[in-house]
Swiss-Prot record:
BP GO annotations: amino acid biosynthetic process; aromatic amino acid family biosynthetic process; chorismate biosynthetic process; shikimate metabolic process
Name of the protein this chain belongs to: Shikimate dehydrogenase (NADP(+))
GO CC annotations on file: cytosol
List of residues binding shikimate: S20, L21, S22, T67, N92, D107, Y230
Length: 290
């Protein structure tokens, strides 16, 4: 990559951000299309967020990704917020055009794309169990509701968080039935048989741990499992799904698809099919990476 005075800059802000897999993913797509763009990590401490955002805009950055811990804190610093980002209550992508900063959330787009491409799953009228009630769960629940899911149930250790998420989405998306249960309910005999899809939005699996008592063999025929975790590529949840013959996929496809959506927002171009996911897989295969 050769950077000149004409190179258009994109990047990612977070704290920390050195571990991010987004730079190789986006730069691979820029290179494949011959676009004079570059994507770089910008470490921005929480107490410097406002100054950092103003600086990026002043320097003419085309846009940037937003990761932990800034996805919510950035909201009041933006000029406009896209409807889906407003519903989710978090932003992971910002476009800068003529000094106007517009916030988007492409996580939901990424999830829906991955569900369709990896599992052939269409949410319309289907029942989905979402494990967790944090930021990733919020984007999942919102996107599934917007896509017409018939029923979305949130299972979480903190019942208050699960209830709050379900009730909020129920008020905003009346076309979908939202419910909540304590996480321990997933081990109850027969409970899983009511769902077409199970989505893990938590960090469970990253350290080789699993969900106690969760028996995927109880899922009905044709049901699927999606795990947002992508490191390791095969979590205990996915390993169990393979053993019992349940179609499943890891979070790599979602990570690539949300990046593709951000790429389109910034450039107006479509990344070559599979380019970003291949770059991610290559980086993950490099020793010392997540």
């Amino acid at each position: 990559m050769t950077i000149t005075g004409k190179t258009r800059v994109t990047g990612i802000i977070g704290w920390p951000v050195a571990h991010s897999l987004s730079p190789p993913m986006h730069n691979a797509a820029f290179e494949a299309l011959g676009l004079d763009f570059a994507y770089v990590p910008f470490p921005v401490a929480p107490e410097r967020l406002a100054a950092g955002i103003a600086g990026l805009a002043a320097l003419g950055v085309v846009g940037f990704s937003v990761t932990i811990p800034h996805k919510v804190a950035i909201l009041p610093l933006l000029d406009r917020i896209a409807p889906e980002a407003e519903l989710i209550g978090a932003v992971n992508t910002v476009a800068v055009k003529e000094g106007i900063l517009t916030g988007y959330n492409t996580d939901g787009i990424g999830l829906l794309s991955a569900l369709r491409s990896k599992l052939g799953f269409q949410p319309e009228g289907r029942s989905v169990l979402v494990l967790g009630a944090g930021g990733a769960a919020r984007s999942a629940v919102a996107s599934l509701g917007l896509a017409g899911a018939g029923r979305v149930e949130v299972a979480n250790r903190s019942l208050d968080a699960g209830r709050g998420l379900a009730e909020t989405m129920g008020e905003r998306l009346p076309g979908t039935v939202f419910g909540f249960q304590p996480l321990g309910r997933v081990s109850d005999k027969g409970y899983l048989s009511g769902f077409d899809l199970v989505v893990n939005t938590t960090s469970v699996g990253m350290a080789g741990d699993g969900f106690a008592g969760l028996d995927l063999s109880a899922l009905k025929r044709g049901a699927s499992v999606y795990d947002m975790v992508y490191a390791p590529l095969v979590t205990p949840l996915l390993a169990q799904a393979e053993v019992v013959g349940v179609p499943s996929a890891n979070g790599l496809g979602m990570l690539a698809a949300q990046g593709e959506a951000a790429f389109r927002i910034w450039t107006g171009a479509v990344p070559p099919e599979g380019c970003m996911e291949k770059a991610l897989a290559a980086r993950l295969a490099t020793p010392g990476n997540p």
